[in-house]
């Protein structure tokens, strides 16, 4: 089973990304050798286990095994802004503590990579545009953009 950790600063769009994953979704299976923790959101999709951890939580010592369990880390950033100190701190923490784990950047709320994000050009970067607003606090991302990422992950593991 492949584990995909979705993380990023507060407000970057992690929950929107997770909520936008296609249906049907299966039940998340807790990996071996990690503490049983309450995850913000988790699911199985096409043989991949997705789980969401907020950036402040991800950098806590209690969560280090969850971070190391991931086969891929999807780091969500607010694409309409430049990388902020929270994104940079999280990025540096992940690079230092999990140097051999593949990382993908998902820029939320945009359809283009701006100059400020080019620092990370050695990593695969995806853009995810806005889908629809459900209410003032809830939205879903562009279905086509999310499917592109899921397809990439599936092909990566074939």
Task: Describe each region flagged by the PLM.
Residues 1-34, 45-48:
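Conserved G1/Walker A P-loop phosphate-binding module
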Residues 9, 53-55, 77-80, 108-110, ...:
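Structural motif
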Residues 42-46, 65-70, 95-99:
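Conserved catalytic network of the ASCE P-loop NTPase/AAA+ motor domain
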Residues 45-63:
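Switch II (G3) loop of P-loop NTPases
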Residues 72-76, 98-111, 123-129:
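Conserved beta-strand/loop subsegment of P-loop NTPase cores
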Residues 82-107:
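Amphipathic helical hotspot of TIR/SEFIR-family domains
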Residues 113-158:
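Canonical P-loop GTPase G-domain recognition
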């Amino acid at each position: 089973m492949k584990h995909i950790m979705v993380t990023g600063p507060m407000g970057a769009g992690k929950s929107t990304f997770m909520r936008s994953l296609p249906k049907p979704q299966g039940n998340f299976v807790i990996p071996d050798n990690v503490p049983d923790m309450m995850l913000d959101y988790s699911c199985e999709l096409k043989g991949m286990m997705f789980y969401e951890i907020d950036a402040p939580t991800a950098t806590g010592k209690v969560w280090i095994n969850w971070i190391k369990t991931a086969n891929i880390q999807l780091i969500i950033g607010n694409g309409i802004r430049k990388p902020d100190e929270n994104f940079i701190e999280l990025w540096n923490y992940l690079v230092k503590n999990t140097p051999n784990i593949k990382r993908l950047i998902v820029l939320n709320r945009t359809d283009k990579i701006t100059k400020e994000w080019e620092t990370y050009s050695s990593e695969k970067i995806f853009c995810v545009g806005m889908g629809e607003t459900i209410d003032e606090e809830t939205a879903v991302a562009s279905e086509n953009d999310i499917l592109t990422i899921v397809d990439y992950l599936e092909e990566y593991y074939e």
